[in-house]
């Protein structure tokens, strides 16, 4: 179930707000310029689908985003618990970073935790299958795939080079709850 938990960026011990209601989540995030919507991820992708299979199955969703914002490229990230690089990938994404473009993800399987450092608050957004999130360019954030990752998401980019991060060097992510 999708969820949003908001913390002070000075105190990770006590949430200020929490909801699993998609409309409430969208309202809170939209007020900060973050797009959050529930889309439909209902295609049967089979076991361990190839990226091309995922792209073909959801080309209509990609086309919608391209028409809206003029995005130039897309790919698929899919990680499972048996991936030998899961620990290194998790560590990389857990470092707070920004992008020079929006970070757009459409979750078609599984779940992951986006953590957004906006002003003096941290917004932890548990995204799951059917969730579309677009984090505005320049927003400090990190992503937690969990110790046993299980997700497939379509990534949409302005930059034809794909995922390019600028790490902030802030260790804030270490203080906040992680996805198990």
From Swiss-Prot:
Residues that coordinate or bind Fe(2+): 97, 99, 103, 141
Keyword Iron: yes
Pfam families tied to this protein: ARD
Site, as annotated: Important to generate the dianion: 105
Positions bearing the site annotation: May play a role in metal incorporation in vivo: 96
Site (May play a role in transmitting local conformational changes): residue numbering on this chain: 102
UniProt similarity note: Belongs to the acireductone dioxygenase (ARD) family.
Function: Catalyzes 2 different reactions between oxygen and the acireductone 1,2-dihydroxy-3-keto-5-methylthiopentene (DHK-MTPene) depending upon the metal bound in the active site. Fe-containing acireductone dioxygenase (Fe-ARD) produces formate and 2-keto-4-methylthiobutyrate (KMTB), the alpha-ketoacid precursor of methionine in the methionine recycle pathway. Ni-containing acireductone dioxygenase (Ni-ARD) produces methylthiopropionate, carbon monoxide and formate, and does not lie on the methionine recycle pathway.
Protein name: Acireductone dioxygenase
Originating organism: Citrobacter koseri (strain ATCC BAA-895 / CDC 4225-83 / SGSC4696)
GN (gene name): mtnD
């Amino acid at each position: 179930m999708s969820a949003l938990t908001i913390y002070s960026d000075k105190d990770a011990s006590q949430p200020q707000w929490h909801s699993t209601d998609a409309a409430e989540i969208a309202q809170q995030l939209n007020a900060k310029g973050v797009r959050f919507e529930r889309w439909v991820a209902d295609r049967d992708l089979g076991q361990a689908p190839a990226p091309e299979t995922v792209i073909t199955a959801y080309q209509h969703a990609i086309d919608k985003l391209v028409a809206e914002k003029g995005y130039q490229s897309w790919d698929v990230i899919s990680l499972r618990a048996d991936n030998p690089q899961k620990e290194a990938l998790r560590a990389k994404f857990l470092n707070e970073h920004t992008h020079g473009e929006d970070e757009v993800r459409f979750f078609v399987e599984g779940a992951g935790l986006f953590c957004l450092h906006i002003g003096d608050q941290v917004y932890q957004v548990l995204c799951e299958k059917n969730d579309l999130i677009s984090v505005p360019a320049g927003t400090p954030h990190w992503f937690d795939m969990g110790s046993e990752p299980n997700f497939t998401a379509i990534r949409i980019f302005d930059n034809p080079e794909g995922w390019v991060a600028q790490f902030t060097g802030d260790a804030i992510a270490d203080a906040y709850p992680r996805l198990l």
